[in-house]
């Protein structure tokens, strides 16, 4: 399945153990992740700046993302497609790649619910869709 992970999910996967890390691992192992140079740069800048992750760890992480993602040129998206113009890039990636899911914690994206054929979901919603809920034995450990 083709999946776009928002920078906030990719950052949270490094910043702490938990759901976003599990979502990333699931995508790396079982799905086709979509990325762009701009998305990886955004992750890199925020990890180095706001989060203060040591540069060698950031480099290794970004290299892993590059090696395990299909890079796509985003499709054009109408400027009024979402509230935050910075999110147009992600919608363009989802559109160009034919992504089934765009996984994000960004309310400006989540309020859309879908964009064309892509479902826009939280990390929890994605996890529940691909793993089932904990009562079915597929939840987070």
Where is each model-derived feature located?
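PIN-domain endoribonuclease scaffold, especially VapC-family toxins
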Residues: 26-78
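Active-site neighborhoods of divalent-metal-dependent phosphate/nucleic-acid chemistry enzymes
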Residues: 67-102, 107, 111
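Residues that scaffold the ATP/ADP-binding catalytic core of kinase and kinase-like folds
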Residues: 12-14, 46, 112, 129-130
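Acidic, PIN/NYN-like endoribonuclease modules and their adjacent C-terminal/linker elements
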Residues: 81, 88, 107-141
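A secondary-structure boundary/capping signal
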Residues: 6-7, 35-36, 105-106, 122-123
